[in-house]
Amino acid sequence: MLQLKNITKDYKIGNEKVHALRGVSIDFRESEFVSVLGQSGCGKTTLLNIIGGLDRYTDGDLIIGGKSTKEFKSADWDTYRNHSIGFVFQSYNLIPHQTVLSNVELALTLSGVSKSERRQRAKEALVKVGLGDQLKKKPNQMSGGQMQRVAIARALVNDPDILLADEPTGALDSETSVQIMELLKEISKDKLIIMVTHNPELAEKYSNRIIRLLDGKVVDDTNPYDRNIVEPIENKKGKEKKAKKPSMSYLTALSLSLNNLMTKKGRTFMTSFAGSIGIIGIALILSISSGAQLYIKSVEEETLASYPISISRNSMDMTSMMTSMMK
């Protein structure tokens, strides 16, 4: 399903080259819970970003469903992220003025899904994470664990094959962290979950595979995938997805914008008022400038009319002058 072949990632800082990943080769099963452990700066998040199509590898190859990504264009990466990947981060990234249901629906607005289907799939995803009775709440009315559940529901609503989690329990207390890990473990029964974490205890307890990185290299893999072993894939049959070009309708974009304006009436009014003052000020300055120019022109015309300028022509008789000089 997902295979990394000798992946290398380099960053250039001035004249120096920093090696984030050095020849990483990993094969993943179609459904498993993989935890990536390592010290800060060892390349964990870089690895996750490359798998998710958020960053490009320098060398090597990322193979998705048996297809190389070396020739992938931006549109191909967009389709891959939109249909095959779900992201869960340490920060929930929820829109505060939208309800829980609307936040989850938002993930489907780029997939060309009808409004009724979006609503139904969002409800099902929230029920799956245990928030079926919290649909109308806003994010600021929920606990950290509940908001992370909303983020997980948003990642699942598009039915991705792979769920990428970057420190999903980093901002949660120990009890809530356990709840989130239990949820991820349940999801991993039919999806590939790759989680970056600094918590080895949670990783060892809930993951069925742990990969350790050091200085951009894989130094340990507790349960490597042997491609010679044929695993049952009956639960994946019939899941072929029809790739659609990601897009958001103008009506949806307008609706989101108006909703944002209406939920922040005070700021919208103050912004409009300040903008109006600016526009009125510019119009006033232009009017004064135009009036002053007209007044100056009027004064000039009146002054010239009172003191007319006369032009006379004088001629000199050069013949008589020459005659007198020759005498």
What is each stretch, according to the model?
Residues 52:
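Helix-to-loop junction immediately C-terminal to a conserved catalytic motif
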Residues 83, 186-195:
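Conserved catalytic loops of ABC-family nucleotide-binding domains
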Residues 98-106:
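Short coil-to-helix segment of the ABC ATPase nucleotide-binding domain corresponding to the Q-loop/switch region
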Residues 138-148:
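Conserved ABC ATPase signature
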Residues 163-166:
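Catalytic Walker B motif of ABC-type/P-loop ATPase nucleotide-binding domains
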Residues 267, 280-310, 314-318:
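Alpha-helical transmembrane segments
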